[in-house]
């Protein structure tokens, strides 16, 4: 493991052939197989900031293919093992029920997991887990249903299960399904797709501010703001402006240059361009960001509140620092010209991070060759694939996806599977915290943790208090709500709300608190009383529009808005950018309410599936200096009520290659014929047509079905040349 060195010096050494330990031990050689490294050897290939080190917590065979991790109240680590994910280049048997959720325990507190049990066996690619007070919530690939698993005899193996929330089947690409299961400050359980309210063991679903808000992973900060990411949308941190449940805003959130990754592994195994080949194939834009967390640990006071996001293609982890002005946040790379953690090991594939109960930063590393789902990993050249070229930004050379397959096969990467490591990052000279025993503690003991310096302890204690439903904790919570610790005052109020014990007096006192964070939380908590037009709350809010803290004032506006009275804030604080952005959002929503019913249903499909590349406004999402996908708002195929024959073909089979002479960053519009019904595809077309082209008609499922039948035998995506022959 190496401490940070100046990137300019590193780049110069690379070009001069002076870096001796690239990719693995030895010089870069594109004609050899890359060796599999031991955890200790792999750690030596990592760079982290000076004064910090990486430790191995678990590795194969104790853990295999770790795609997601979560701690329970006693510090045990639950791991989703994707034992069928891309076990070969053909994704053979990928949906076979042989994956697992395993439970790892550090029995002696030395920082190494030493006991493993298979908590759940023989399942399909578990995507998310949330260990609670007496159960573990789990979601699996191919379904949105959430299950509750119970370990009645506490032997580390689940004994029974029940449905916590029954969802629909989800046969979309496995990289675009449900993810999350995060207990938030407002006592909702958040996923990337929706929020859930805990109700005595069952879950009640609620929407986010729009459809799917994140791809794989979800994080929260001290004040309940979510940090989202898009893999295909090349965005490690977005939509972090407002607490969960409020509008997701289409505003600029990042500093110039934020989207440039700074990896050090010169392995050209990504297909869609974005490589600086002159710099040994260094990735120039994000492509697979996922697994984010927010650092909320006293071990890292200098980074507290920053977020981490994994980039497995770039073999790096980005740390994002947030600055706030007039209540609006901006994301910055915390290490300009570098990254928080990066590796030269070809098989280092970080996919998930957690801020742990001991205060350390935990990283789940799939440690494998292929991190591309089969849909975007063709292995043979067909006539349709001949046009699937993407342009390298620096050399203007063409490379095909199939050529990428042959490269990685030559390097031996296709056969590196069934490994996996879990690391933790710790500071030199500082002791990690003790392991918790919350599952064995009384409610009174849990209340004391609400003022803990580690955010993980506060969140877990609040979750356990609310999910237990023990109203005997209410007196202690009231005392903490009036105490000296800011975090304690906030969490105690939210715990009281979750237990149905919050009183108006505690809300009104919080609205006058010396801490802006307590005032903001109390304004949010006041919304039920405001909706009932409680005179005391109306009077208190009326005097808070001029709060010196811009985030508090913004929350006051949101409270009036939630009660259907945004006019009560009219003419106040015009300098607040988020207030203006929410008003703009509401104006746009008012127009969408006039859409047809099929278009409104299609909007959900669009926001869950298409928005990460085509953008909320239909103008395309920009990554580095290129759009990921063409602007639908300018599509000639959608003009004049649309060419359904062409549009349905694109949705069903996908489209590849340049469009109008432009090579878009995503490279391929994926086929949707297997994942979406004729009705869903008709509705998403209707939404896009009405939204950006003024269509006066709805596309029918029958129209899509006819095209589906006509092209049933076709293999591979369409090219622009193909579609020209079909369209006018």
Predicted regions and their residues:
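Beta-propeller domains with acidic blade repeats across secreted/periplasmic ectodomains
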Residues: 24-445, 456, 464-466
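Flexible coil segments in periplasmic/lumen-exposed cytochrome c-class electron-transfer proteins
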Residues: 26-33, 375-376, 583-597, 664-728
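The canonical Cys-X-X-Cys-His
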Residues: 364, 422-425, 602-617, 669, ...
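Post-cleavage N-terminal segment of exported redox proteins
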Residues: 427-437, 498, 528, 561-600, ...
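Structural detector for internal amphipathic alpha-helices that build alpha-solenoid repeat scaffolds
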Residues: 433-436, 456-469, 487-501, 506-512, ...
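Short inter-helical turns and helix N-cap capping residues of alpha-solenoid HEAT/ARM repeat scaffolds
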Residues: 453-454, 484-485, 514-516, 548-549, ...
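Gly/Gly-Pro-rich "capping" loops immediately C-terminal to redox-active cysteine motifs
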Residues: 483, 619-678
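Electrostatic cytochrome c docking/interface patches
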Residues: 584-607, 617-624, 628, 636
């Amino acid at each position: 493991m190496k401490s940070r060195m100046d990137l300019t010096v590193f780049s110069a050494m690379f070009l001069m052939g002076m870096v001796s330990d690239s990719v693995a031990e030895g010089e870069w050689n594109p004609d050899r197989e890359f060796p599999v490294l031991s955890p200790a050897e792999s750690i030596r290939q990592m760079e982290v900031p000076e004064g910090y080190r990486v430790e191995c917590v678990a590795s194969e065979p104790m853990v295999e293919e770790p795609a997601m991790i979560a701690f329970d109240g006693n510090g045990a680590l639950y791991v989703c093992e994707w034992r069928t994910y891309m076990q070969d280049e053909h994704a053979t048997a990928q949906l076979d029920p042989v994956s697992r959720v395993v439970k790892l325990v550090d029995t002696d507190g030395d920082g190494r997991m030493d006991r493993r049990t298979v908590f759940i066996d023989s399942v399909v690619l578990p995507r998310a887990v949330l260990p609670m007070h007496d159960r573990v919530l789990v979601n699996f690939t191919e379904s949105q249903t959430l299950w509750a698993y119970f370990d009645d005899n506490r032997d580390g193996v689940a004994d029974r299960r029940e449905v916590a929330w029954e969802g629909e089947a989800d046969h979309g690409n496995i990289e675009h399904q449900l993810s999350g299961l995060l207990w938030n400050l407002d006592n909702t359980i958040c996923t990337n797709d929706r929020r859930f309210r805990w109700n005595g063991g069952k879950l009640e679903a609620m929407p986010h501010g729009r459809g799917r808000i994140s791809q794989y992973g979800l994080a929260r900060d001290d004040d309940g703001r979510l940090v989202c990411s898009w893999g295909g949308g090349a965005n490690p941190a977005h939509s972090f402006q407002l607490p969960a449940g409020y509008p997701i805003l289409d505003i600029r959130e990042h500093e110039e240059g934020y989207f440039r990754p700074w990896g050090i592994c010169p392995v050209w195994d990504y297909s869609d361009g974005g490589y600086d080949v002159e710099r040994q194939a260094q990735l120039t834009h994000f492509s697979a960001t996922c697994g984010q967390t927010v650092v909320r640990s006293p071990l890292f006071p200098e980074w507290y509140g920053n977020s981490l996001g994994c980039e497995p293609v770039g073999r790096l982890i980005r740390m994002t620092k947030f600055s706030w002005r007039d209540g609006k946040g901006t994301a910055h790379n915390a290490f300009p010209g570098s990254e928080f953690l990066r590796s030269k090991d070809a098989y280092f594939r970080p996919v998930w991070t957690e801020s742990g109960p001991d205060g350390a930063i935990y990283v789940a590393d799939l440690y494998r060759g292929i991190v591309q789902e089969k849909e975007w990993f063709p292995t043979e050249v067909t006539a349709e694939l001949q046009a699937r070229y993407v342009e390298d930004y620096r050399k203007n050379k063409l490379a095909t996806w199939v050529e990428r397959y042959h490269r990685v096969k030559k390097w031996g990467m296709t056969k590196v599977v069934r490994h996996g490591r879990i690391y933790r990052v710790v500071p030199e000279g500082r002791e990690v915290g003790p392991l918790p025993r919350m599952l064995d503690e009384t409610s009174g003991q849990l209340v004391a943790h609400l003022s803990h310096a580690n955010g993980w302890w506060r969140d877990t204690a609040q979750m356990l208090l609310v999910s237990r439903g023990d109203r005997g904790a209410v007196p202690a919570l009231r005392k903490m709500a009036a105490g000296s610790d800011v975090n304690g005052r906030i969490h105690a109020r939210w715990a009281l709300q979750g237990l149905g014990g919050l009183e108006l007096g505690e809300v009104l006192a919080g609205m006058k608190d010396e801490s802006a964070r307590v005032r903001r939380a109390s304004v949010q908590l006041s919304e039920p009383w405001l909706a009932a037009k409680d005179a005391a709350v109306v009077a208190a809010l009326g005097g808070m529009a001029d709060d010196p803290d811009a985030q508090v004032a913004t929350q006051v506006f949101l409270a009036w808005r939630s009660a259907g009275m945004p006019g009560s804030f009219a003419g106040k604080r015009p300098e607040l950018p988020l207030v203006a952005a929410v008003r703009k959002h509401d104006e746009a929503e008012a127009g969408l309410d006039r859409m047809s019913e099929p278009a409104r249903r299609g909007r959900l499909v669009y926001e869950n599936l298409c928005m990460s590349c085509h953008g909320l406004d239909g103008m395309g999402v920009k990554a580095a200096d290129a759009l990921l996908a063409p602007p639908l708002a300018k599509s000639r195929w959608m003009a004049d009520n649309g060419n359904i024959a062409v549009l349905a073909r694109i949705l069903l089979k996908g489209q590849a290659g340049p469009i109008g002479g432009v090579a878009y960053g995503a490279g391929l519009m994926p086929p949707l014929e297997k994942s979406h019904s004729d009705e869903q595809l008709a509705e998403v077309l209707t939404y896009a047509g009405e939204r950006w082209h003024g269509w006066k008609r709805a596309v029918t499922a029958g129209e899509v079905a006819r095209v589906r039948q006509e092209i049933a035998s076709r293999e591979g995506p369409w090219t622009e040349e193909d579609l020209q022959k079909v369209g006018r």
